[in-house]
């Protein structure tokens, strides 16, 4: 089952465009052989050359050896877990923290169903979904930045 928008052939504007040949892909240059034989290998080899050059010129240091008997002062998760880590760190009740963690994917699952009756794909014509996305992004950035700060400055980011 695919979700594709079918064109409304009764629309006079669309019929006028199709009559002029604007609805078909007759413009531009073909992907074969121009892109696939000449441009893509140059881009791939250039990317490999940049990676090898960076690896040779700026090798990453191994760092200090691990000491199993010394625990670091603060253990931080990977960067993509910072917002959820901040939720767990600031909420005093463990059950509430776990429920808030579960609400993150549950909230993400509801976003496509907001304004799903709207036929427009332009985000400016879907104000509710766009607002939910922008507020969610701002909250995730706020929590992610706050997770890197000490607990007393984490919610205000040291600004207030």
From Swiss-Prot:
The keyword Transmembrane helix applies. Gene3D superfamilies: plastocyanin oxidoreductase, Single helix bin. PROSITE patterns: CYTB_CTER (PS51003). This is Cytochrome b6-f complex subunit 4. Belongs to the cytochrome b family. PetD subfamily. SUPFAM superfamilies: a domain/subunit of cytochrome bc1 complex (Ubiquinol-cytochrome c reductase). GO terms for molecular function: electron transporter, transferring electrons within cytochrome b6/f complex of photosystem II activity; electron transporter, transferring electrons within the cyclic electron transport pathway of photosynthesis activity; oxidoreductase activity. It is a multi-pass membrane protein. HAMAP family: Cytb6_f_subIV. One of its GO terms (biological process) is photosynthetic electron transport chain. It comes from the Eukaryota. Its main location: plastid. Keywords: Chloroplast, Electron transport, Membrane, Photosynthesis, Plastid, Thylakoid, Transmembrane, Transmembrane helix, Transport. The keyword Electron transport applies. The 4 large subunits of the cytochrome b6-f complex are cytochrome b6, subunit IV (17 kDa polypeptide, petD), cytochrome f and the Rieske protein, while the 4 small subunits are petG, petL, petM and petN. The complex functions as a dimer. The chain crosses the membrane at residues 36-56, 95-115, 131-151. Component of the cytochrome b6-f complex, which mediates electron transfer between photosystem II (PSII) and photosystem I (PSI), cyclic electron flow around PSI, and state transitions. GO terms for cellular component: chloroplast thylakoid membrane. It comes from Coffea arabica.
């Amino acid at each position: 089952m695919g979700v594709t928008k079918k064109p409304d052939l009764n629309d006079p504007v669309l019929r006028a465009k199709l009559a002029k040949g604007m609805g078909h892909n007759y413009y531009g240059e073909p992907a074969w052989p121009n892109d696939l034989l000449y441009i893509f290998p140059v881009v791939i080899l250039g990317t490999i050359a940049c990676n090898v050059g960076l690896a040779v010129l700026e090798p990453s240091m191994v760092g200090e050896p691990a000491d199993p008997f010394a625990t670091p002062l603060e253990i931080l998760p990977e960067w993509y877990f910072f917002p959820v880590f901040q939720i767990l760190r600031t909420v005093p009740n463990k059950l509430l923290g776990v429920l808030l963690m579960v609400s993150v994917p549950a909230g993400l699952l509801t976003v496509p169903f907001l304004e799903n009756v709207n036929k427009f794909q332009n985000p400016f014509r879907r104000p509710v979904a766009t607002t939910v996305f922008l507020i969610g992004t701002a909250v995730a950035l706020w929590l992610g930045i706050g997770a890197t700060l000490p607990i007393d400055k984490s919610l205000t980011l040291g600004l207030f």
